[in-house]
């Protein structure tokens, strides 16, 4: 590409592509996904784990409430809930007061699954943040939470 003022400006902007937030977040997520596959022997995904945790802690929830608690979008929750219901991890039913809503409930199998996965997920977190001291880990998680909160606000 011939050097021009515009091209030089673009080159300066893209030169450090490996340091862009999206790229770094994707790499971190890739590391998490790889570690999940290595460390968590329970047949469950990260999103399924979070959904089961929400139901285990809060009891029966409609899908909108699950979305608020887990930051999962409606279509993801609907797809997850369908798969998880087929596996017997949760039950889905129509809300008695508002037939448009679907209420999710963790089953005994779901409770066993989340309990079996929890120590491995904890271990995954320890390995993922092994190079950080406790204060750095807390600060990093705070930063990630704030980025997520900002994205959710629009």
Model features per residue range: what roles?
Residues 1-16, 135-154:
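C-terminal regulatory/oligomerization modules of transcriptional regulators
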Residues 1-42, 106-108:
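N-terminal leader segment of winged-helix/HTH proteins
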Residues 4-5, 33, 60, 82-142:
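Charged, amphipathic alpha-helical coiled-coil/dimerization segments
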Residues 16, 20, 24, 50, ...:
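Amphipathic alpha-helical recognition patches that constitute DNA-binding helices
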Residues 57, 91, 116, 146, ...:
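Conserved amphipathic alpha-helical interaction elements at protein-protein interfaces in regulatory
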Residues 23, 30-76, 87:
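N-terminal helix-turn-helix DNA-binding core of bacterial DNA-binding proteins
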């Amino acid at each position: 590409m011939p050097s021009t003022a515009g091209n030089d400006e673009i080159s300066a902007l893209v030169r450090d592509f490996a340091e862009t937030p999206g790229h770094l977040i994707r790499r971190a997520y890739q590391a998490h996904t790889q570690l999940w596959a290595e460390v968590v022997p329970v047949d469950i995904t990260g999103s399924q784990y979070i959904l089961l945790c929400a139901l285990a802690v809060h009891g029966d929830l409609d899908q909108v409430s699950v979305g608020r608690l887990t930051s999962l979008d409606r279509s993801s929750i609907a797809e997850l809930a369908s798969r998880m219901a087929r596996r017997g991890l949760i039950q889905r039913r129509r809300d008695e007061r508002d037939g448009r809503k679907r209420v999710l409930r963790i089953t005994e199998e779901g409770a066993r699954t989340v309990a079996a996965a929890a120590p491995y997920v904890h271990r995954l977190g320890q390995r993922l943040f092994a190079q950080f001291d406790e204060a750095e880990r807390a600060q990093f998680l705070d930063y990630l939470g704030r980025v997520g909160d900002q994205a959710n606000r629009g």
